[in-house]
A protein has these predicted regions:
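Functional transmembrane alpha-helices
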Residues: 1-129
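Cytoplasmic/organellar membrane-interface segments at the starts of transmembrane helices
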Residues: 53-55, 108-178
Length: 178
């Protein structure tokens, strides 16, 4: 995004950095919650846990959708701006990046399917407890941010506009020095 040097791609890159911090932070929290219960991060150790942890499964799916850039959630805004702003300058690289977005979506959905769907595949998962009040109160603000930014991207864009313009002008200045 930033390397394309265009205003739209730079603005998208800044927004994507913010969104990645929110979404990746939420995913790490969620993985940590599960690790505290089972003391493993091995995907094959799970299966069917949405039966015992339905709130956790719903929040993990929502966060996964935000991570892969589903429209209406925060991950879409920056990714779309980056791809649109970069395409004119770097058609092949932008196409490869768009393919990477598709691969990331496939992986996230594959992981979700293995961990959450189907019957419970490990007896240790039968006694897993769903999110407690502390965990719920710590993850919900991030979930609300993902939704808010996805629905009202202009709000976060209003904070980014000036910086994106400054970076665009700086890049243009350095192009003129050559």
């Amino acid at each position: 995004g930033i390397s394309a040097g265009g205003y739209l791609s730079i603005e998208g890159a800044i927004i994507q950095m913010i969104n990645h911090g929110i979404t990746a932070g939420a995913l790490f929290m969620l993985v940590g919650f599960l690790y505290e219960r089972r003391h493993t991060r091995n995907i094959s150790s799970f299966g069917g846990i949405k039966i015992t942890m339905p709130r956790y499964a719903a929040i993990f799916l929502f966060t996964s959708f935000a991570s892969i850039g589903l429209p209406g959630l925060n991950g879409f805004v920056g990714e779309f701006m980056i791809l649109m702003g970069s395409f004119n300058s770097y058609k092949v690289l932008t196409s490869i990046a768009a393919f990477g977005v598709v691969l990331a979506a496939i992986y996230m959905l594959w992981a979700y399917q293995r961990i959450f769907t189907g019957p419970i595949s490990n007896e240790k998962n039968e006694s897993l407890k769903d999110l407690d009040i502390r965990e719920t109160l710590s993850i919900v603000p991030l979930v609300l941010l993902m939704l808010f930014i996805g629905i009202y991207p202009s709000y976060i864009e209003s904070f980014v506009i000036q910086e994106a313009g400054f970076i665009t002008e700086t890049i243009a200045l350095f192009k003129d020095i050559k």
